[in-house]
UniProtKB/Swiss-Prot annotation:
Protein name as annotated: Lipoprotein-releasing system ATP-binding protein LolD
GO cellular component, one term: plasma membrane
Locations listed in the record: Cell inner membrane
One Pfam assignment: ABC_tran
CDD domains reported in the protein's UniProt record: ABC_MJ0796_LolCDE_FtsE (cd03255)
Subunit note: The complex is composed of two ATP-binding proteins (LolD) and two transmembrane proteins (LolC and LolE).
Its membrane topology: Peripheral membrane protein
Amino acid sequence: MKRNVVLQLTGVERHYGQGGTLLSILKGADFSISKGEIVALVAPSGTGKSTLLHVAGLLEHPDGGEVNINGHACDGLSDEKRTAIRRSQIGFVYQFHHLLPEFSALENIMMPQLIAGLSWKEAGERAGQLLDYMRIGHRGSHRPGELSGGEQQRVAIARAVANAPTLLLADEPTGNLDPETASYVFDALEALVRQSGLAALIATHNHELARRMDRRVTISDGKIVDF
């Protein structure tokens, strides 16, 4: 594996049964992403973007091939160990923010840190720093329903990186936002990736944002190809 490679997929297969027929989504897919790199995943709906993110994020088991995270093979690991890797090394951002409505922005960002064993004080300090970095420190006490769409997504991004993961997987993170807000949220995301050295794989239909990333890949006949 090349130096600084965070995620490496080698010959990954993923199939689903559909009405007695085997549907092949990923067919010998190869892909790698390195520290500090932002890669756009641009492909039509139904071609396997979410499947790829789920396999890369250890949410689904591949039917063949290898998934390596930071040089460690994840095939054959128990569900407990896969969960431990997800919690410590992988952050997820989705099109819908999935923030807990009864908690403030600050508390939402603290939550994964508290689960990881940090003290309330440590988690609060880290959450506050992330809110400041995302330029919404003044909104920390507000609940998700009191935030704008762009603010909600910035909180979701901050929560995703709260435990300092090495890999960020995002599925249409700006899909529900207007173009101006989407660009602003991506600016914040890009700055965070560059500053922290994260590797980020971002699925998007927004070609303008995709062109701003380091590389663009798509899924063609079950394989991952640059374009």
